[in-house]
Structure formats: C-alpha cells, structure tokens
Design a protein with these regions (language model features):
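The feature marks non-catalytic terminal segments
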Residues: 2-13, 20, 177-373
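Active-site rim/loop-helix segments in enzyme catalytic domains that contact anionic ligands
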Residues: 2-144, 165, 172-176, 180
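A short helix->loop->beta-strand "cap" motif at the edges of active sites that frequently abuts
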Residues: 57-58, 192-195, 654-657
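Short acidic, glycine-rich surface-loop motifs adjacent to enzyme active sites
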Residues: 145-157
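Long beta-sheet-rich domains in secretory-pathway and surface-associated proteins
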Residues: 375-577
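Aromatic-Pro/Gly-enriched surface loop or interdomain linker
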Residues: 554-631
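A glycine-rich, often tryptophan-bearing local segment used as a flexible ligand/cofactor-contacting loop or short
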Residues: 633-718
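Catalytic beta-strand/loop cores that center a nucleophilic Ser/Cys/Thr
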Residues: 688-756
Length: 756
C-alpha cells in the first residue's frame, strides 16, 4: 500500500508538532519500567497502562506469548499463520498509541509457542509450548527490557484460558531465573533483578472465562481515572483507541468521559520480601532521577542526577515553548552524560540502562523541539534478491546541520548518489522478509533498513533513527500464484483438478509439479490438470510446484487500512484431499457473514450450493430451496438475516431443512426467539466447549438420520480433527430438540449441546 499525498496530509494533520512535542516529553517524568505480560495480542491491560505511561511517564513494555493464530478473524478470511501476521501488525499499532515496547515469546511461524487453540490447562499449554523454551524466551525478554515491575494480566487458576495460566505461572519463574547467573548463561546478557510482581486483584470471569477461585486481596491500586491535560482525552478512551487496532478481534468501543477507572492489584512477590502496606506501586522504587542515586547507593551522582531531573521537569513545564524546551533538554543531556561517565561499577546495573533510555528519549524530544523533519521513501516496497532500489531522504532541518546515514541489513550495500538518494543493493541469496518480528519499539526504527539522523548539540552527538514510511517486503527468488492451493476430490463425483499459474517470477521460468503415484499431470502453458487414475484411494496428496527445478514459494498478501501491507511466503503447491462422499439432493442455499467458507468447500465436494448475499436474503423466496445453511455468526454479521427470521421459521414448519452453524450468545442470538424453540448457548464459553481435538465422540442416537444419511458417520470420521472438538455448545434447549452427540474433556462432565 503506497501512501498517497492525501494519506500523508491526513497523517500530518492528525499529529501536529505541538502534540508530538507533548507526547515526547512525558517519558522524561520517570525512570521506572513496567512490564505487562499476557498470552495473546489484546491481553494487555491497556487503560491501566495508558495512565502509567502517558500520565506518569513510566516506560511500558508487554511480553506476549504468541500471535493469536488460533483466534477468529472479524474482518477477513485469513486464519492461523496469516492471521498471526495481521495480529502482529495490529499489536504494533496498538502499542504505538500508548508508547509501549512489545516483545513476543514466539519468534517464527514454526515456533512451538503457538496459539494452538483454546486450552483449559496451564500444564497442557506448557507441555505443548515446551516449558524450557517458554522460560528461555521469557528470561531473555526480561533481561533485555529490565523491568522494575512485572504484572501479568490474568491469574493462574482453573477456569482461565490455559495459555493465560501458563504465562502467569511462567512469569514468576522467569523473574527468578532472570536474576540467576547460572540460568541461560548462553544468552550473553547481564542478569536482571525485577523488583516486584503484581497480580490482578479482579476477577477474570466473563463471557469466555469462569475463574474457579476468587482473586487475591487488593494491596494497592492504580487509578486511571481522568484525562490527559493537553489532549483532553480520558486515558480509558486513549486505551480504547489503542485496542481498536485489534480489528480482527472486533476490539475498541466508545467510552463516555469522566467514568472512574481503578485497577486493584495484589503485591504477590518482591525481591526484598512481600510488603503489603503500600500507598503506590512506586513505593520503595526510584520513580525519578531524584531518587535514583540513593536507590543505587551512589551518593556521588546525587547532585548530577537531581540537576538532570530538574531540567527534565522544567522542559515539560515549558511546553509548548520550543526554545525553552530545547534549552532545558540540553541541560539534562549534559548532566546525564556526566553521570554516565562517573557512574561507579557497583551501581551501573541500576543506573546506566535508565540513563541510556533518557538519552534516547531526550534525543527524540530534541528533534521535535528543533523542528527536524525527515521522510524516508523507497522507489519500491517489494523487491527480489539480487535487485536494487533507491532510498530517498527528504530532510528539512531549518536550524540544524543534520547528517543522514543509511543503516543496512547484513550484507546489503549502499551507494550514495545525488539529491539525498541512495542505491540499495540486496544480496542474491537474501531470504524473504520476516513476517514475525519478535520485538517492536515505539521510540526508534524497527525495520532492518532505516535511516539514522545525527547532529551536534554543543559537544554532544545526538542521533535518532527513522523507518521508511512503508514496510519493504523482500520477496522470494522463485514465486508464483496458484489459482488454488487446496482441493477436494470426491471419488463419488470425480473431476480433474485444474490449476493455473500467474505472477510467475522469473517470468520465463519452466513450471512443473512434482509427480504423485495414481495421478497424471498434463500441462498447457501455465495451466495444469491433475487427473486421478482408476483405483485412486482416499487420502491426502501433495503436488509441489517447481520453477526451473527450484522449490517455489507463493506470497500470501494482506492489505488493511489500519495496518498497511503485510505478507507471508509459503511453499507453493496443491494439497488434494481425496474422499468418497455421497452428495445430498435438492436445492441448497448458504447464508454467511464472512466468517467461514463452508459454501466454498461444499462446492469443492461437488455440491450445488447457492450463496446468498445480505441483499439477496432480504428478497429471496425461501420456498425455492430444500435446505438452507446459516454460516458461523451469521445472525450477527448478515444484516438482513434477522428480518427474515419469521419466514425462516415458517419455511422449516412447511418442511424446509435448516442447518445453523455455531453462534455465540452475543451474536444477536435470542434464546427465546432465534431458534424455532428455546435454545440457550452456554457461557462462559470455557464451560461449554471441548478443547481436546481427539476427545471421544459418543453417538447418542446412532440410528438418527443425521448420522446415516446420505453418508454414515463412523468413528474414523472424527479422526484428525483440528484445533479443538467444538465450542459454543448449547447449554439448555426445549425438549423438541434431540441431542445427537456427547463429548467431554478429560475428567469433565460430558456435554450434549454440540449437535441438536
């Protein structure tokens, strides 16, 4: 997505210099750091964090286990790993709003720390993630970030998501290990002593979870009530704007200003022994540079650090006088430089990283105070190994002599040409861009290719780093787009599998698929037929695409206005699932809302199904169909469906066959009115789902026609289930309904509301 002039103007006007200046000054209030931990993107306690960071100046960070690959997509069709790519970008945008660094425990799409689906057990989760792997990543993140306070979002108790339990349990272990020189010494990072661990003193129960135990007692609270004095926006509202970037999860809601927002916490652990008599989470910690020398037992730096903090406070008070802000920031910078030079080794572990943070924060603020503007653009935002592109810096520095340097990924080269333009060359063996970066910072460049600006303030060299205005995506050496990558061949209705190739790179490559026994492959230019031979058996068949005999990748592109462009490169090929299924008779309609592709897969089987849009639903004559299939969440996501509810009921009573896929209680589902007879969907959902994908499925009514017509459902049909057995089961229903299946997780009561 290349930014247009209108995009740039909109972005500029949404963030004027005076507001950027105010926001850049806030981190100068404090030298403390606070790390929130969770399992998935959107687990952050955003309202509390917004107040801590934007009001109190606390350095914020989040350690998150995985990318939320197992969740649902409220805005598109991407699932699993592609959804993880989108949610990674969403999390970065959400973190940017509240000036929060973000760390992922999972490093790659293949990482064991994966959102494998809902879990009811922290132990099960850690078994799948690998506890040692989880702790290794957690410890590394703590040692890199050096938080004073760690605060998990959820409690490690039964009734919570197993991923949440696992992260909270691991947080306590990781805090201890991060301070242990013998633990993960191969990381080559200094140990770090977290000072406090807080737990939420509120219940995590709700529509999804059902905590079995009450929360721990409140020992202190964070009051997030109120508004930023310059922005005039409540911290809770800023938080909701941040959460609105979790768009695949439908996050973000309007909150009226002035509402109270108080977050009770429990001091669960401290490095000096638990002290529950606190007035603030900042008690016994160096909130500002005023307290740092005493805390670090470094009296010789007391005067210097106090001068620095005094100057920082004066800079904040001087807003929006840029000249005065600049003067005070230089004074602070000078004193911080003296403190770094004179800091004794015995105190350096508690002091130097805080002063390094202050130098970076001051540098960012100085750039705004001096009105240094730099826009970094690329001649193209997709490139191949071996190619070159141009990077241009549009630098406007009216009162300052600024030098721009291009920072390159390893083995890339740069040649300076005219007019602030640089020729960037990519190695011929470069790998595709990483869709799963494991770290994002709000106060520096994050892209491997970026620009560093340097200038002098007196004798002090100051620098900031800037990303290009859009991401650069390095694409594969060999790639192609396939008309289909997953297919179904029904032996009861066999057809040739047709695959066409487009976007072939290099364009003149020779294209072929790997051969498979039982199949014949014919080719006409870039069009292929996969023809099954007589005697082909059921199973999965994979045909890999080769270009000039080389393994090839396909590019899964994603483009949404709230995140920009993203992509993930995957091995190119076609997976064909061969089955033997008797097809139903009659006219079938599908009414969806964009959350499933059931109609797509029915057509792959050979079923003649007509997909009805919301507009078509409004006017369709239902009597024309023998069966109607209502898709996942469709009563919420298909705007016109509820207006035809009575017609649907009448159609069923007249003999129509209605199949409704799963819905949540909040999907415009009225237990008294949506179904033909009373049907209540269970909540919290944790109690009405079976997470074990291999759980035994008991056929309560083995002779029921649903299990026998037109195909007999046997035990083997429940094999190789993905993610979980099922969720959003019915809790109660009218006696008119007959439960067909019984399923349960280990040591839990059986559930009969999966299929009625």
């Amino acid at each position: 997505m290349i930014l247009t002039d209108i995009d740039r103007l909109t972005k500029q006007n949404a963030n004027p210099r005076s507001i950027k200046m105010w926001k850049a000054l806030q981190p100068l209030r404090s030298c403390l750091s606070f790390m929130n931990t969770g399992a998935h993107p959107d687990d952050e306690t955003t309202t509390m964090l917004a107040a801590l960071g934007l009001r109190d100046g606390i350095r914020l960070s989040q350690a998150c286990a995985n990318r939320g690959e197992g969740g649902q997509n409220a805005i598109g069709s991407e699932i699993t790993l592609d959804l993880g790519v989108i949610r990674t970008c969403e999390m970065e945008r959400a973190a940017e709003v509240i000036n929060m660094s973000h760390y992922w425990l999972s490093e790659t799409p293949e990482d064991t720390i994966f959102d494998f689906g809902f879990s009811k057990s922290g132990s099960e989760t850690l078994e799948k993630w690998g506890e040692q792997r989880t702790l290794e990543r957690f410890v590394l993140i703590i040692r890199r970030e050096r938080p004073d306070i760690v605060c998990p979002t959820f409690l490690d108790i039964s009734g919570q998501h197993g991923h949440h339990q696992a992260m909270t349990r691991s947080a306590f272990k990781a805090v201890l290990l991060a301070a242990d020189p013998a633990a993960f010494s191969e990381q080559n990072l200094p140990i770090w002593q977290v000072k406090k661990v807080y737990l939420p003193a509120w219940s995590g129960a709700g529509d999804a979870y059902d905590d079995d135990a009450p929360p721990p007692p409140e020992t202190v609270c964070v009051n997030s009530t109120g508004a930023d004095p310059i922005l005039g926006i409540d911290y809770a509202q800023i938080a909701q704007y941040s959460r609105s970037f979790h768009r695949t999860q439908g996050m973000g809601k309007w909150i009226e200003p002035g509402l109270p927002s108080v977050w009770p916490l429990n001091l669960a652990w401290s490095c000096d022994g638990i002290e529950t008599h606190e007035k603030s989470i900042y008690d016994h910690l160096p909130k500002t540079l005023f307290e740092l020398s005493e805390y670090a037992k470094c009296a010789e730096l007391d005067t210097t650090l106090c001068k620095a903090q005094t100057a920082l406070n004066q800079a904040i008070s001087a807003w929006p006088d840029y000249t005065s802000i600049h003067k005070y920031l230089i004074t602070a910078l000078q004193n911080i430089a003296v403190a770094i030079t004179n800091c004794p080794d015995a105190s350096s572990a508690e002091i130097l990283h805080r002063l390094s943070d202050k130098q970076r924060q001051i540098s960012n603020a100085l750039a705004i105070a001096k009105n240094i503007n730099c826009r970094v653009t690329l001649s193209q935002y997709e490139a191949r190994p071996g190619e070159s592109l141009e990077l241009t810096t549009d630098l406007n520095t009216p009162d300052c002599n600024v030098t721009a340097h291009v920072k390159l990924p390893d083995r890339w080269t740069v040649e300076k040409s005219e007019n602030n333009t640089h020729k960037i060359s990519i190695p011929s063996d470069e790998e595709p861009s990483d869709p799963y970066p494991d770290t994002w910072y709000p106060d520096r460049a994050n892209a491997p290719l970026n620009v560093v600006l340097e200038w002098y303030e007196g004798d002090h060299l100051v620098s900031i780093s800037i990303d290009p205005e859009e991401r650069l995506h390095v694409l594969p050496t060999f790639s192609a787009a396939l008309s289909q990558t997953d297919a179904v061949l029904n032996l009861a209705n066999p057809v040739n599998i047709k695959v066409s190739l487009t976007q072939i790179y290099p364009k003149d490559s020779n294209c072929e698929f790997s051969s498979m026994q039982g199949w014949e492959i014919s080719q006409n230019d870039n069009h292929f037929k996969l023809q099954p031979s007589t005697g082909l058996t059921e199973g999965m068949y994979t045909f890999n695409l080769l270009l000039d005999k080389n393994p090839t990748k396909s590019i899964n592109r994603m483009n949404y206005s709230h995140i920009g462009t993203a992509n993930r490169c995957v091995s190119s090929g076609v997976n064909v699932q061969v089955v033997n299924v008797v097809l139903p008779q009659g006219r079938i309609a599908y009414i969806g809302g964009g959350n499933d592709r059931t109609d797509f897969w029915l057509r792959k089987l050979g079923v003649d199904v007509e997909s009805l849009t919301s507009e078509m639903v409004q006017n369709t004559e239902l009597s024309e169909y023998d069966s109607i299939l209502i898709g996942v969440f469709a009563f919420k996501t298909c705007p016109t469906l509820n207006s035809r509810l009575k017609d649907l009921h009448d159609w069923v009573l007249a003999g129509g066959n209605l199949v409704t896929l799963y819905h949540r209680p909040w999907d415009n589902w009225d237990p008294e009115a949506t179904a033909l007879a009373y049907l209540k969907i269970g909540k919290p959902s944790l109690r009405w789902r079976v997470t074990d994908e291999s759980a035994d499925v008991l056929h309560l009514e083995p002779n029921n026609q649903l299990l026998n017509t037109p195909n007999k459902i046997t035990k083997s049909d429940w094999d190789n289930w993905d993610k979980e057995r099922g969720l959003y089961f019915a809790e109660r229903w009218d006696e008119t309904y007959t439960p067909i299946l019984e399923i349960s997780d280990t040591n839990e009561s059986p559930l009969r509301g999966a299929l009625l």
